[in-house]
């Protein structure tokens, strides 16, 4: 043509038809040119590993609880979109089945007994043992008796500042003390208070982390959201409204998304906020989901790559990103008590894949667990999700928070690897559970350490 423009190149794989059902065509990579003048060209490179198109075997067809490549011919195509690909660019014949990663069963469903196949027939699924109704109360950690009100730290009338009387966190930052040495001075009460959200200050309206003044732990503020920094409207401070996540994904341009992340993070930093509650990365499963505008795509690869770019941009400015909502938060109606029932294969290949890509590529400082139940257990108290998969399999190094005001008891969340309860914790009940032996001090200490490590990484 006669106009300058950019071109998107997409790579697809056509896997062989084997014993495991697979998509006929799957996106495995993409790239976008710079702005090209008429007649100008650019060479693009798209790289991907076999893991990108491996299938997860949750039935034991080839190897149970493993990512596998079935034997047969894999055809790779390039094009502008899935409907307009050129002839097969490359063929590879795999002579035998390959086990790429041997894992173990996690987050298996209890009430999904059949899987529909391409021909309309069904295959029986293995399910985790269903929890008897009489055990639900124990599983969900519902307190046996009494009410446990939130304890607010005592305020000193007329005193705006408390002189430091304890070793300060800045001494850890300066290398005068190790974090372990400093933490050894904290009481159980100190640690439990740190694991709940803290009051707003400044322009923030989504609460903060930390806030232990006698030890010099700052109250690090958070702020929404995926379309730009959102602060108290009465403050009179204007911020930029960036294009929504879905529109950003339509660009296929991770470079632009990275720049937007950095620009937004500068606004976050200027307004005294430490953690920006973005990106949101749940799958576009249905057009009826009330948060689709905050989510990138129906394709987990696109969602994961866009989120990774956003996190890289945000954290390049010394601001923490919060990857959310982990996981399967695909509806807003009754979102705090709805149960997302999904097979382990669909969970790993679709609903967790974007999170996996983002965590492995960009290491967000925080991950936010979701409100909903996942196969019968609240995500915020699901140890297989938050510890075994997120940290054990993917190598996540940061802190996990709940979404705001989840229904699960805080002590069960801490034990699962959910470090901080937002927008506030339940210190009295959590401390009671520690003293009764239902929550270990080691689990509490681990969560506090993750919180403090996150604070020390902020600019």
Residues covered by each model-derived region:
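Glycoside hydrolase catalytic-domain context in secreted enzymes
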Residues: 1-84, 105-459
């Amino acid at each position: 043509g006669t106009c300058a423009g950019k071109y998107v190149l997409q790579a697809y794989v056509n896997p062989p038809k084997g014993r495991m059902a697979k998509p006929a065509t799957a996106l495995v990579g993409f790239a976008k040119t710079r702005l090209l003048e008429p007649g100008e060209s650019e060479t693009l490179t798209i790289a991907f590993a076999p893991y990108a198109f491996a299938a997860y075997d949750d039935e034991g067809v080839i190897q149970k609880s493993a990512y596998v490549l079935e034997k047969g011919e894999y055809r790779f195509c390039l094009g502008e979109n899935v409907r307009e690909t050129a002839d097969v660019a490359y063929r590879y014949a795999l002579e035998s089945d390959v086990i790429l990663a041997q894992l173990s069963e996690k987050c298996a469903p209890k009430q999904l007994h059949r899987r529909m196949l391409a021909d309309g027939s069904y295959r029986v699924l293995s399910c985790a043992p269903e929890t008897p109704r009489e055990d639900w109360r124990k599983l969900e950690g519902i307190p046996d008796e009494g009410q446990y009100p939130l304890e607010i730290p005592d305020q000193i009338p007329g005193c705006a500042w408390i002189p430091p009387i304890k070793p300060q966190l800045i001494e850890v930052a300066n290398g005068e003390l190790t974090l372990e040495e400093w933490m050894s001075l904290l009481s159980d009460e100190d640690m439990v208070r740190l694991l709940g959200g803290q009051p707003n200050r400044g322009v923030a309206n989504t609460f903060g982390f930390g806030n232990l003044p006698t030890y010099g732990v700052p109250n690090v503020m958070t702020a929404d959201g995926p379309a730009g920094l959102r602060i108290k409207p009465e403050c009179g401070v204007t911020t930029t409204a960036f294009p929504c996540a879905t529109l950003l994904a339509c660009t296929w341009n991770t470079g632009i998304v990275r720049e937007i992340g950095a620009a937004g993070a500068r606004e976050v930093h200027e307004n005294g906020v430490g953690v920006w509650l973005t990106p949101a990365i749940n799958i576009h499963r249905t057009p009826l989901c009330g948060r689709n505008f905050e989510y990138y795509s129906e394709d987990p690869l696109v969602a994961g790559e866009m989120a990774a770019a956003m996190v890289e941009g945000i954290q390049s400015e010394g601001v923490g990103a919060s990857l959310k909502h982990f996981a399967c938060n695909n509806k807003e109606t009754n979102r705090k008590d709805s149960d997302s029932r999904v097979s382990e294969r669909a969970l790993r290949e679709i609903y967790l894949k974007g999170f996996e890509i983002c965590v492995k590529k960009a290491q967000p400082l925080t991950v936010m667990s979701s409100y909903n139940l996942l196969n019968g257990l609240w995500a915020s108290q699901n140890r297989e999700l938050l510890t075994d998969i997120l940290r054990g399999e993917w190598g996540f190094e940061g802190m996990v928070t709940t979404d705001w005001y989840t229904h699960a008891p805080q002590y069960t969340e801490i034990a699962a690897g959910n470090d901080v309860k937002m927008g506030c914790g339940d210190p009295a009940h959590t401390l009671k559970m520690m003293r009764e032996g239902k929550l270990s001090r080691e689990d509490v200490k681990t969560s506090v350490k993750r919180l403090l490590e996150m604070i020390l990484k902020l600019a």
